[in-house]
């Protein structure tokens, strides 16, 4: 029925903008393409096969809490999913709550204020040394809304060799696709981080984690003057 096309197009936009945003293919049979509209109906179509999980499983969230309690060197990796979910505040709250510095993927830049003490900058092949070094030394990675692309990980067989990985993502197909994870949590970044902060509200970071974040902040201070150095202006040479 050609008359259903208006509803299909509207529904495709709803799907494209929900869950993990992305393109939607509309496959239109030839007889529909050649048909004529008798009416205009823009009501949404029921799509029972598409139902993104927004709220993370509370049992998985509690397991994440337990892994965090055991960690001495936690870090947070933030991707574009944090920005799309408007979860920057929840991300920052978790970072300070558990003494875990934050680094971002290229698409995750802006998930945390780059001038924040907890921000280590971007990781990966175009990232900062302090960020990449901390990946290798950490014992727990909390990855939020990130795909673990090769631009961020480099060689997979040498990525985060000492870390357990918690992966939070609204798209279950992304979890475990590139990097093996110890704890998957499917859900909207804002909702899951809010739940995690809630179960950790009485958490007191251990001394090892406090020393860890202090060490990384000091490393960042040592590296940054090299890119902000302005004591002696550069002079062009012939």
Report each predicted region and the residues it spans.
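Phosphate/pyrophosphate-binding active-site segments
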Residues: 162-238
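Structural signature of the thiamine diphosphate
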Residues: 1-43, 67, 132-164, 199, ...
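Glycine-rich, anion-gripping cofactor-binding loops and their flanking helix/strand elements
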Residues: 80-166
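Hydrophobic/aromatic beta-strand patches that form the interior of the parallel beta-sheet core
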Residues: 24-26, 103, 142, 166-168, ...
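Short gly/pro/ser/thr-enriched loop/turn and capping motifs at secondary-structure boundaries
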Residues: 33, 108-113, 149-150, 172-176, ...
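Cofactor-pocket helix-loop regions in the catalytic cores of large enzyme subunits
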Residues: 3-4, 27-117, 210-238
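Conserved acidic residues
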Residues: 72, 139, 182
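Short beta-strand elements at the ligand-binding edges of bilobed clamshell
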Residues: 51-55, 115-127, 178-191
